[in-house]
């Protein structure tokens, strides 16, 4: 497991720790601007590259591959425990984006954290996830760890179709420069295995089941792009928000211009400020 830690140059008056669970295909190295913003304000920012992402390679496969969804949650816990030993007695805040938001939502114990922020999350049908997982398991028997263009298209293709006449990755980033940077990043993975999809579907199914009794024992802030198809253009994420709000009144939601990856799009400064304001409350 590869772990990135960004700390302020000074060690006095530290405000807290911010743990990031990043999104699918990307890695922690993409969060340098986020880290600069928050370390300059007295926070330590850290996070691990999720299994098979970035520098957290796996010997089982050369593409995006997860053997067991629970391993992603265990890695998140291990990263936190390591950093807390290094920087004890500081409040910890948790941020999950996209894939990372589902890792956060399936973590059984959030009590070590003071607040959580969920970005680009949504509500998926548990029944549909089971059907698709069964179908893929049969179709790709013996090829579960091999990259598949069809699996990639299954996971991302429908999002691009929501924006006719736009570039393929417009659903992810609206800014042309940001989109080129993403496409040209050699550590961003586009090769997805059937096993990865199946394990991710287990995480989404678990998060969907948990909506009946969501694990939101701490204050939660939902953030999403108004044109984000992953969040159901606001409909899916608001469904999750309402379930959380019923269990915990200390739950908020904010929307921003843009599509899915609002932390890296052209309006990222306003998202950073909203997070900083939330942490100060």
Task: Report each predicted region and the residues it spans.
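Active-site glycine-rich loops that stabilize anionic/oxyanionic intermediates
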Residues: 22-26, 98, 226-227
């Amino acid at each position: 497991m590869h772990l990135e830690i960004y700390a302020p140059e000074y060690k006095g008056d530290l405000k807290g720790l911010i743990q990031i669970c990043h999104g699918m295909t990307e890695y922690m190295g993409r969060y340098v601007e986020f880290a600069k913003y928050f370390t300059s304000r007295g926070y330590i920012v850290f996070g691990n590259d999720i299994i098979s992402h970035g520098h957290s390679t796996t010997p089982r496969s050369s593409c995006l591959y997860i053997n067991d969804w629970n391993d992603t949650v265990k890695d998140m816990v291990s990263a936190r425990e390591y950093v807390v030993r290094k920087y004890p007695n500081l409040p910890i805040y948790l941020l999950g984006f996209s894939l990372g938001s589902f890792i956060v939502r399936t973590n059984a114990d959030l009590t070590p954290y003071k607040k959580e922020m969920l970005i680009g999350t949504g509500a998926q049908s548990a029944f549909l996830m089971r059907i698709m997982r069964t179908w893929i398991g049969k179709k790709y028997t013996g090829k579960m760890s091999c990259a598949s263009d069809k699996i990639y298209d299954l996971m991302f293709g429908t999002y691009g179709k929501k924006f006719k006449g736009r570039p393929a990755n417009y659903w992810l980033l609206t800014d042309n420069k940001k989109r080129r940077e993403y496409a040209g990043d050699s550590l961003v993975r586009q090769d997805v295995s059937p096993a990865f999809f199946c394990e991710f579907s287990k995480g989404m199914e678990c998060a969907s089941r948990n909506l009946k009794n969501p694990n939101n024992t701490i204050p939660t802030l939902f953030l999403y792009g108004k044109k984000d198809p992953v969040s159901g253009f606001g409909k899916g994420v608001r469904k999750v928000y309402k379930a959380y709000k019923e269990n915990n009144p200390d739950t908020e939601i904010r929307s921003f211009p843009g599509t899915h990856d609002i932390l890296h799009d052209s309006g990222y400064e306003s998202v950073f400020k909203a997070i900083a304001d939330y942490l100060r409350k």
